[in-house]
Amino acid sequence: MAFQECVIEVAQDQAEAWSDALFDLCALSVSVEDADADTPDEQPLFGEPGLEPTKLAWNRSRVVALFGDDTDPALAVAAASNALGIDPVPAYALREVEDQDWVRLTQSQFEPIRIGERIWVVPSWHDAPEPDAVVLELDPGLAFGTGSHPTTRLCMQWLEQNLKAGETVLDYGCGSGILAIVAKKLGAGDTLGIDIDPNAVEASRYNAERNQVQADFALPESVSEATYDLVVANILSNPLKLMAAMLSARVRAGGRLILSGVLERQAEEVAAAYAPWLPLTVWRSEEGWVCLHGTRP
């Protein structure tokens, strides 16, 4: 069976309506993407699980609908446009998608990733490329963080080069738990991962068990306000600015703070938000993203 993928670029306030209309017209699946993804104009969206997001789509959104061979995408787009009162019908692109072993295809897209000098992130269906490597077995799943994004790589490289054996670590916004797990594998002492999403906490616990490391993971309201030698937060610039006082307070005197999820153009304003508590500078940048670090006096 062959499928057809239809791609339409729409305005931010039309993305949800187009998605609903195409679903009503027999689309098998519909997704909305940032039309500026992987460019300097990429626009991160964030929100808390269980709450309505502040924005439902990107300024320039790309609606991608998949149709079976029993549906004409051109007719569906025309009908959706008519139902939405949009004239003329917007331009769209079609691409044929052949049916295949989707599990095998998905697995083939996730190869082992080398990060820094010694760290490898390896899906469970692959063997470790180097016997003496620091290996994290991690599959794509519910929570963010498989080592493929520049911000995750930057934080892992920082830990590889700067973590001292026995240092206590707080991973705030732990996602998949990848940073807490690699910290333990690099010799960290007591390590805690915190996330506001219960699914992320469960995913982190599962990944830690698979990797045979002892680390704790919890929701923020269930842990004490202890201080740590290292606090790492790979989130996004706006939440990082809002949490400046709280995250700074979790760093012990003489301890270090590592932040990522920050674009190069956002680095100065994030550093300014933390300036009352500790100085932050750019440690390294990659693909337009930066890792900030600093020591608390």
Curated annotation (Swiss-Prot):
It is found in: Cytoplasm. It catalyses: L-lysyl-[protein] + 3 S-adenosyl-L-methionine = N(6),N(6),N(6)-trimethyl-L-lysyl-[protein] + 3 S-adenosyl-L-homocysteine + 3 H(+). Its EC number is 2.1.1.-. GO terms for cellular component: cytosol. S-adenosyl-L-methionine binds at T152, G173, D195, N234. GO terms for molecular function: protein-lysine N-methyltransferase activity. Signal peptide: none annotated. GO terms for biological process: methylation. It holds the Pfam family PrmA. Keywords: Cytoplasm, Methyltransferase, S-adenosyl-L-methionine, Transferase. PANTHER family: ELECTRON TRANSFER FLAVOPROTEIN BETA SUBUNIT LYSINE METHYLTRANSFERASE (PTHR43648:SF1). Methylates ribosomal protein L11. Belongs to the methyltransferase superfamily. PrmA family. This is Ribosomal protein L11 methyltransferase. It comes from Cupriavidus pinatubonensis (strain JMP 134 / LMG 1197). The lineage of its organism: Bacteria, Pseudomonadati, Pseudomonadota, Betaproteobacteria, Burkholderiales.
